Amino acid sequence: MAEASNEPYRPLTVDVDRWAAAATPEIAHQLFEIVDIVDANGALRRALTDPSRSGEDRARLVHTLLDGRANEVAVDIVAELASQRSATERQLGDGIERTAVLVAAAAAENRGGGHALEALVDDLIRFKSMLDRSADVQRAFSDSRASAEAKVTLARRLAHTESDEAALLIERAVSAPRGSLPGRLLEQFAQWVADRQQRWIARVETARPLGEEQLARLQDGLNRLYGRDLKLTTETNPSLVGGLRVQVGEEIIDGSLTHRLGQLQQRIGA
């Protein structure tokens, strides 16, 4: 694919949380279908990544082409991705693919919270491990003569999962790896889901171990703050001096004495 600009490659991203409440496996499936359309149509791909067109114009083009033909959430996501400047023509398809995985993860989250995300990661890694152990299965999925439908049928026979989201991502990886290897793509899918799973884990560092009552109060406070039942992990770090440090996903709450002293030093220029 031709280069759209000389800008360095970076992932196109959207805030999936904007649509998380409405996320379903079907919306993720439609996003994957849109990836296939973009990959297969060079003229469309160039139009949606053309740096001479404004982001608003590219987003309007998405709505013109897809409104009424795909789920409104899927169309809005693709329009927002297309409105961003792409460094390469492939970048848009990559961004839609990644977002499709995150929408599938959000659908699992809606169904079963952090436990469903953990199970989804396990399903993906388990299937990848099965692939790694069997050269025959690898050859079956890499056989260019086999249809996508045949590969999906084989994946359904081999994947022992009751999760619609896991089935979707596994079938996608083996039937449309977009130039990658199915196992490698499954590993990438699992990493994206695992990144989202971090939103359900609170990593707590304290200068001294907390008692059971303190942990219970902290758990309750964090659950109320984030609006979900977090999994708490604790670690003692004497260098904090006092207080505690909590990380949930990429957000950090630092109430340690060390951090407060550092802030004071910054304010006074020490």
UniProtKB/Swiss-Prot annotation:
Keyword Cytoplasm in record: no
An example Gene Ontology molecular-function term: proton-transporting ATP synthase activity, rotational mechanism
Disulfide bond annotation, renumbered to this chain: none
Primary role: F(1)F(0) ATP synthase produces ATP from ADP in the presence of a proton or sodium gradient. F-type ATPases consist of two structural domains, F(1) containing the extramembraneous catalytic core and F(0) containing the membrane proton channel, linked together by a central stalk and a peripheral stalk. During catalysis, ATP synthesis in the catalytic domain of F(1) is coupled via a rotary mechanism of the central stalk subunits to proton translocation. This protein is part of the stalk that links CF(0) to CF(1). It either transmits conformational changes from CF(0) to CF(1) or is implicated in proton conduction.
Keywords noted in UniProt: ATP synthesis, Cell membrane, CF(1), Hydrogen ion transport, Ion transport, Membrane, Transport
Location(s) in or outside the cell: Cell membrane
The family this protein is said to belong to: Belongs to the ATPase delta chain family.
Subunit structure and binding partners: F-type ATPases have 2 components, F(1) - the catalytic core - and F(0) - the membrane proton channel. F(1) has five subunits: alpha(3), beta(3), gamma(1), delta(1), epsilon(1). F(0) has three main subunits: a(1), b(2) and c(10-14). The alpha and beta chains form an alternating ring which encloses part of the gamma chain. F(1) is attached to F(0) by a central stalk formed by the gamma and epsilon chains, while a peripheral stalk is formed by the delta and b chains.
Gene Ontology CC: one annotated term: proton-transporting ATP synthase complex
InterPro entries: ATPase_OSCP/d_CS, ATPase_OSCP/dsu
Topology relative to the membrane: Peripheral membrane protein
Protein name: ATP synthase subunit delta
